[in-house]
């Protein structure tokens, strides 16, 4: 089963388009857990177990594990190996040239065993190809990101008047998706850009981070990005789920938050 089949299976089984981002910030974690690599492993594993029937995917951000050195990377490896069912998208934002890109692709897909990865397109097609050739894995191209400064470059206008983010989306559609394993990362904080990209790429999967703590509006995101009966949309939420409670019942609180978000996404989809 390839990544997209695994994603569709989890989405159908759990009636969910929610992806939970695993961004374990020690300062925000429950007080009952240690703030070291073992603590972030325990925290993320508990979140996954509590939400396994409510999500379509998980998205661990590699930076929060790398910050703990070798022990943090080991914690990430353990999480990937013990994932409970829904596929895992490694939020690594890789992008480099030649043999370096080849090594990154081996690290992500062969050594670690992630189901999908986020990629930066700005070094060009040759930097993406080592990942793209893994046809059974997902490759999510950073297109219009959710951060406030994304417009510094991504909104820049080309000679033909298109914003750079739209050119990236169209290249993903026409050049990089030959194996059918490419999706786009488009921030929920930019609903107008979401709508532009959906019009240009009606058949591509969109991963939309930024709902919740970053200020993205769920209903506006769904209206802009959903694509008919098969919405081709994953809504990623991190902090609202992870840090729903800092007490010993943090996992139960995360489950409640995830259920509410899943149901809200489904309600928004029905309203489109």
From Swiss-Prot:
Annotated GO biological process: 'de novo' pyrimidine nucleobase biosynthetic process; 'de novo' UMP biosynthetic process
UniProt pathway annotation: Pyrimidine metabolism; UMP biosynthesis via de novo pathway; UMP from orotate: step 2/2
GO molecular function: orotidine-5'-phosphate decarboxylase activity
Swiss-Prot/TrEMBL keywords: Decarboxylase, Lyase, Pyrimidine biosynthesis
Catalysed reactions listed for this entry: orotidine 5'-phosphate + H(+) = UMP + CO2
Coiled-coil ranges (or none): none
Family annotation (PROSITE patterns): OMPDECASE
Annotated EC: 4.1.1.23
NCBIfam families tied to this protein: pyrF_sub2
Family: Belongs to the OMP decarboxylase family. Type 2 subfamily.
Protein name (database record): Orotidine 5'-phosphate decarboxylase
Source organism of the structure: Roseiflexus castenholzii (strain DSM 13941 / HLO8)
Lineage per the UniProt record: Bacteria, Bacillati, Chloroflexota, Chloroflexia, Chloroflexales
């Amino acid at each position: 089963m390839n990544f997209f089949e695994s994603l569709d299976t989890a989405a159908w089984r759990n009636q969910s388009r929610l992806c939970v981002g695993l961004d374990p910030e020690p300062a925000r974690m429950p007080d009952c857990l240690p703030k070291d690599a073992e603590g972030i492993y325990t925290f993320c594993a508990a979140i996954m177990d509590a939400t396994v029937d409510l999500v379509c995917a998980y998205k661990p951000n590699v930076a929060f594990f790398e910050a703990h050195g070798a022990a943090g990377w080991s914690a990430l490896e353990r999480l990937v190996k013990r994932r409970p069912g829904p596929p895992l998208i490694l939020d690594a934002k890789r992008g480099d040239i030649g043999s370096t890109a080849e090594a990154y692709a081996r690290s992500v897909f062969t050594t670690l065993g992630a189901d999908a990865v986020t990629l930066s397109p700005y070094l060009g097609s040759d930097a993406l190809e080592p990942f793209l050739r893994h046809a059974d894995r997902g490759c999510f191209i950073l297109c219009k990101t959710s951060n406030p400064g994304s417009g510094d470059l991504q909104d820049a206008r080309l000679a033909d008047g298109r914003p750079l983010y739209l050119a990236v989306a169209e290249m993903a559609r026409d050049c990089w998706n030959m194996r059918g394993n490419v999706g786009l990362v488009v921030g929920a904080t930019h609903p107008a850009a979401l709508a532009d990209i959906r019009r240009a790429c009606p058949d591509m999967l969109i991963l939309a981070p930024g709902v919740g703590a970053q200020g993205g509006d769920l209903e506006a995101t769904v209206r802009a990005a959903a694509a008919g009966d098969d919405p081709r949309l994953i809504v990623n939420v991190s902090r609202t789920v992870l840090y729903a409670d800092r007490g010993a019942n943090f996992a139960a609180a995360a489950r409640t938050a995830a259920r509410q978000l899943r149901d809200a996404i489904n309600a928004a989809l029905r309203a489109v």
